[in-house]
Amino acid sequence: MLKRDMNIADYDAELFAAIQEETLRQEEHIELIASENYTSPRVMEAQGSQLTNKYAEGYPGKRYYGGCEYVDKAEALAIDRACQLFGCEYANVQPHSGSQANSAVYMALLNPGDTVLGMSLAHGGHLTHGSPVNFSGKHYNVIPYGIDEAGQINYDEMETLALEHKPKMIIGGFSAYSQIVDWKRMREIADKVDAYLFVDMAHVAGLIAAGEYPTPVPHAHVVTTTTHKTLAGPRGGLILSNAGEDMYKKLNSAVFPGGQGGPLMHVIAGKAVAFKEAMEPEFKAYQARVVKNAKAMVAQFQERGYKIVSNGTENHLFLVDLIDKDITGKDADAALGAANITVNKNSVPNDPRSPFVTSGIRVGTPAITRRGFTEADAKELANWMCDVLDNIGNEAVIEATKQKVLEICKRLPVYA
């Protein structure tokens, strides 16, 4: 018999220890991975609810199982809030991840072998935008576009490629691009070749919800996003559209039964909570601080002589180009990690090193801002990072930096 007081600590000491260690790591490390964030206790409460027990294949009001009347309410809330938050007619909240949301779009709109125009992974795109190692690169004819010497998306190149190759779909969006994207220009290019415009806004969804970054929703046929990252919800995916009933039916069928079976109702409940939180004034203020903190860090890195890809940032992330410093991204990642500062190694444009080594690091501010970092704190943090990078391998500098990190983490806990 199941009892309410059952717990992991008394039953599975090994797993409980791992959970406790990760909890401590999150509290004592500064998180700068651009795709990571801290979700709220309310979201975690929803994810730990009894909704996890319910199988609900299908959609609200059209389920294949009985007993779905209450999970229907939860999913309807999530759908309505997503539509309200992003200004659209249609939302599918069932994708288990951003990659599965993207996969559903491919399935709904393309046939294997169709031509797709997507941002090169080496220039800031995502695996699912046509990387050869991903399903998108294996099953479709992908033509990559990139950024120019100034670090801006080269729309003229994109148009030339579109006119030459006549893609059926053009993909906008990125995983490592720090500038404003001209969604309107992308749609104009797509219209010239009668292509779908599909935008993956996963990295900037929170900024878009808060009005801190231009929305692609009025321009794209389909938009996808993750629900974590800047949106700060549970890990999951979301599909949005204003393109009409025929499109909505294709997308729904591609998610279920096309790519998934039963949805994760506890995660959908978490999404509903997160969308409600994203409509609060505090969330909008938070997103504004995310951008300010990123700009403050960029300014400090540049003052210390570090090259920033695209020469700045207009969102939550930026890339530090370490080629001139003769430091690998892998070594920078390890040195900063030893000082309790978590980043990820990242390729930079025209990177001479492999993706497993790289010549850069990607830095993002959603998580530090979530725990209360101000612009002054962000500037100070950038200085600490430069100290470590200027002295790669110097254990004394790493240890001194680690102590500073522990102090600020104690002052600004993730969960107070």
Swiss-Prot record:
InterPro entries: PyrdxlP-dep_Trfase, PyrdxlP-dep_Trfase_major, PyrdxlP-dep_Trfase_small, Ser_HO-MeTrfase, Ser_HO-MeTrfase-like, Ser_HO-MeTrfase_PLP_BS, SHMT-like_dom. Its cofactor is pyridoxal 5'-phosphate. One of its GO terms (cellular component) is cytosol. PROSITE patterns: SHMT (PS00096). The record marks 228 as: Plays an important role in substrate specificity. Pfam families: SHMT. PANTHER family: SERINE HYDROXYMETHYLTRANSFERASE. GO terms for molecular function: glycine hydroxymethyltransferase activity; pyridoxal phosphate binding. It catalyses: (6R)-5,10-methylene-5,6,7,8-tetrahydrofolate + glycine + H2O = (6S)-5,6,7,8-tetrahydrofolate + L-serine. Homodimer. Catalyzes the reversible interconversion of serine and glycine with tetrahydrofolate (THF) serving as the one-carbon carrier. This reaction serves as the major source of one-carbon groups required for the biosynthesis of purines, thymidylate, methionine, and other important biomolecules. Also exhibits THF-independent aldolase activity toward beta-hydroxyamino acids, producing glycine and aldehydes, via a retro-aldol mechanism. This is Serine hydroxymethyltransferase 1. Belongs to the SHMT family. (6S)-5,6,7,8-tetrahydrofolate binds at residues 121, 125-127, 245, 354-356. CDD domains: SHMT. Keywords: Amino-acid biosynthesis, Cytoplasm, One-carbon metabolism, Pyridoxal phosphate, Transferase. Its EC number is 2.1.2.1. One of its GO terms (biological process) is glycine biosynthetic process from serine. It is an enzyme of class 2 (transferase). The modification N6-(pyridoxal phosphate)lysine is found at residue 229. It comes from Vibrio vulnificus (strain YJ016).
